[in-house]
Amino acid sequence: AGFAGDDAPRAVFPSIVGRPRHTGVMVGMGQKDAYVGDEAQSKRGILTLKYPIEHGIASNWDDMEKIWHHTFYNELRVAPEEHPVLLTEAPLNPKANREKMTQIMFETFSVPAMYVAIQAVLSLYASGRTTGTGIVLDSGDGVSHHVPIYEGYALPHAILRLDLAGRDLTDSLMKILTERGYMFTTTAEREIVRDMKEKLAYVALDYEQELETARSSSSIEKNYELPDGQVITIGAERFRCPEVLFQPSMIGMEAAGIHETTYNSIMKRDVDIRKDLYGNIVLSGGSTMFPGIADRMSKEITALAPSSMKIKVVAPPERKYSVWIGGSILASLSTLQQV
C-alpha cells in the first residue's frame, strides 16, 4: 500500500490476521483479540494465522476489513474519507467480490471515490511497455493468470487463470520437507517454509539434468537456520519446489504449466497479433521472483512456438511490486482523476 505517484509502496506486509491460540491469563499485558500483518508474523508462535484472501478472492470479509483498517490507520496513517482509493483484483474474479469490496470501502471507510483495476494490466504499465501490447504472466500468492493485452485493452476471452501460485509452492515444500522428517504443520511454521522458499528456491533450466547434478554432488546444497537455531540443509528441494509451476502434476493438479498456459493464451488470439505477444511476455508478481525463471520460460515457449518466431521474456527487477507501481502510475494520471 502507498500513495499515487510514489515509485515504491510505503507499506508492505503479509495479508494475514492472527488470533491468540490460548486465552490470556495475565491481565494488563495489552493482549489484543487480533493481530494484522507484520505484528501477526512476529507473534506467530502464539497465534493461529488466517489468510483472508484465497486464490486471489477475499473469503473472509471481517478479516479483510481488519487488514484495510490496519493499512489506513496504522501503516499509511491517513483518514480514508479524505483520499480516493485504487484497489486491484485478479482478472475473472466474481462480480460479487468487487461489489462487496466497493460496499466496504464506501460504507465502512467512507472513501470519496474508488476504482478497481485489473492487476495484470497494471504490471504492463509498470514494465514501461508503452505500446500497451504484450502478454502478462502475473503470479502472486494465491493465483496466476495470463492476460494478453493489445494496445491497452485486456482481451477477456483469452485470459487464462491458474489457481496455482506461491502458497501452493510453499505447501509443496512443506510436504517435501516432511518426507525428509522435518515437521512443519502449523500455520506459523508454514511462514518459516515460505521464507525458506523465498530465500533459497530457484528454477532449473533443465529439471532432469539438475536432478542428476543434485544426486551426484553437493554443489547446490544450502543451509537454512530455523528460529530455534537448528540448521537444515536443502539441496534438490530448492528447484523441486518451483518446478511445480511448470509441472502442476507434481502436486496432483490436472493443469498445464505456466509455459503451456502462456502459449495457449497467445494461441487464442488472432494470428496478426501473436507476433507482438510472443515478443513481449512480461513476468510479474512475487512467484516470478525465482532466479532462472525467465530463462526457463523462454526455453519452454521457444520449444512450443513456431521456429521462426522471436521470443522475448521480460522480467523487470521490481516485478514483485509491479502491480502496485502500475497502480501508482494509473492513479496519478489526470484522466483517472476526472472519472
Swiss-Prot record:
Its EC number is 3.6.4.-. Its main location: cytoplasm. InterPro entries: Actin, Actin/actin-like_CS, Actin_CS, ATPase_NBD. One of its GO terms (cellular component) is cytosol. GO terms for biological process: cell division. It catalyses: ATP + H2O = ADP + phosphate + H(+). Coiled coil: none annotated. It is found in: Cytoplasm, Cytoskeleton. Gene3D superfamilies: 3.30.420.40, Actin, Chain A, domain 4. One of its GO terms (molecular function) is ATP binding. It holds the Pfam family Actin. Keywords: ATP-binding, Cytoplasm, Cytoskeleton, Hydrolase, Nucleotide-binding. Actins are highly conserved proteins that are involved in various types of cell motility and are ubiquitously expressed in all eukaryotic cells. Essential component of cell cytoskeleton; plays an important role in cytoplasmic streaming, cell shape determination, cell division, organelle movement and extension growth. Belongs to the actin family. PANTHER family: ACTIN. There are at least 7 different actin genes in tobacco. This is Actin-54.
